[in-house]
Amino acid sequence: MAMFTVLPLIWLAPLGLISLFFYYIIPYFWNYRHLRSIPGPLFARLSNWWLVYACREKSRWKYVNDAHTRYGPVVRIQPNHVSIANEEVINAIYGHGNGMLKSSFYDASVITTYSIFTSRDRAEHSRKRKVVSHSFAPQSMRNFEPFIQQHLNVFLQKWDAMAANEAKFDGYADVESRVWLNYLVLDIIGDLAFGAPFGVLAKGSEVVDFETEKGPSSLPVITSLSTRSEIAATVGALPELKPYLKWSPDPFFRTGFNGMINLRTLGTSRITDRLNNPPGDEREKDLLERVREGRDHKGQPFGKGELIAEALTVLIAGTDTTSSTMAALLYHVVRTPGVLKKLQAELDEAIPADVSIPSFEMVKNLKYLGFVVNEALRHHSTISLGLPRLVPENGNGVTIAGYHFAPGTVLSIPIYTVHHLKEVWGPDADEFKPERWEDVTQRQKQAFIPFSHGPRACLGRNLAEMELKVITATWARRYDLIMRDDTMEILEGLARKPEAVNVGIRRRM
């Protein structure tokens, strides 16, 4: 009897090895044999779990960048996913008219229904873009500027109070600037996309109160955004995981799932409240109102479900990316010798002395400010991962970078790596150096894709540029800053987010 009990246990090891052989090795030699000549980490060539692990570690950018350093510009980072660190093929993968489609990676980011960001169907994306695109046109930015000014004024009140009342022995007050910039951008985006600010800036807290069908509720919005971003990037590497997240023994996945549920609840509550209580005529047209006015090719507006999806897209894309870039920009400007003083000199000359918050018109064409913003976008690369594209299934494949890729192959260009290529940006590519934009080359312009490229590029670029320039100009002109902590730890989800940026501030004399 004991012999029959032991025998099944003895067979477990060989059965496990046989299972692994059929699950990983056979597909490697058969399904993806056309990619066998492309180098990459062995585990990445065999399994999707290499990239899942890199994302789970919140360091995908580092794993992929290290792989390119070791294996070259064309690297397999999944069995059917090739990463190409070559600026010359950006248009071939992301440009107009090439037939490339978004991959299943984007399914992991769907919270309610497909949005303009997550939609993979070309016709559906075109319909959504027609409804939404006018809302982000340059002429719309004039209507959005008062919202930025209003919340920036509250931000200054908070920082002025800290500078006046919490100064240390050296005259500088300690500030964790990343979280305050996050509060600021959250209230701006909340006001624009949901019809009212979240109130996090005034409270100095990430907890947002809202009404649901069951009564009053609250949630930590920054935490929810961060965990949702991390889970979307991780599950995007293996979308088959999504239905099982809430049962995962790993708290990382359960927390990310809860973040998605939190955001869905918040978005539904805020949009429902806005539709039931429309604003008066005295309020400037916000982003939500402009999207509501939009019409598709058949003259139809978005329904409530699509409004929620698009508002959440603006919240997620517009908050994490912009606030992370602002925090990294502040860190490098304060940390890099001479940059803050040079920026302050330009701002002092351009902005009248009695103006606390400059208009976008005052700062949009300032040369050095533009260099600083561009260098922050390049050096930090908030969106650092390669946005995956699928070679169309109904064609003959494509030849890119000297390789032929069969239909169904996933391709991407790692933005962080391309933004740090020494053959493009020079031997000082890893340094923060705004002056490099003084004589930027055509090759560098081609390699600079902080908002992606082509028909699926970020629609919010104009809004992000206005926020970055107006907000940076405001704090840089108003305060002197010193570093309190010279390190800046990075956590990556869909965006590379500084964990904290600790500085000292004081009002300028």
Curated annotation (Swiss-Prot):
GO CC annotations on file: membrane
Broad enzyme group: oxidoreductase
Induction: Highly expressed under trichothecene-producing conditions.
Entry annotated with the keyword Transferase: no
Subcellular localization, as worded in the UniProt entry: Membrane
Membrane topology classification: Single-pass membrane protein
InterPro entries found in the cross-reference section: Cyt_P450, Cyt_P450_CS, Cyt_P450_E_grp-I, Cyt_P450_sf, Cytochrome_P450_monoxygenase
Pathways per UniProt: Mycotoxin biosynthesis
Gene Ontology terms, MF aspect: heme binding; iron ion binding; monooxygenase activity; oxidoreductase activity, acting on paired donors, with incorporation or reduction of molecular oxygen
SUPFAM superfamilies registered for this protein in UniProt: Cytochrome P450
Disruption phenotype: Results in the loss of butelonide production.
Domain of life, source organism: Eukaryota
Transmembrane feature ranges: 6-26
Binding-site positions, heme: 458
E.C. designation(s): 1.-.-.-
Transmembrane helix in keyword set: yes
Cofactor(s) for this UniProt protein: heme
Keyword line: Heme, Iron, Membrane, Metal-binding, Monooxygenase, Oxidoreductase, Transmembrane, Transmembrane helix
Family that this chain belongs to: Belongs to the cytochrome P450 family.
Purpose: Cytochrome P450 monooxygenase FG08079; part of the gene cluster that mediates the biosynthesis of butenolide, a mycotoxin that shows antibiotic activity but does not seem to play a major role in the spread of head blight in wheat. Butenolide is derived from glutamic acid via a 4-acetamido-2-butenoic acid intermediate.
Designated name of the protein: Cytochrome P450 monooxygenase FG08079
Species of origin: Gibberella zeae (strain ATCC MYA-4620 / CBS 123657 / FGSC 9075 / NRRL 31084 / PH-1) (Wheat head blight fungus)
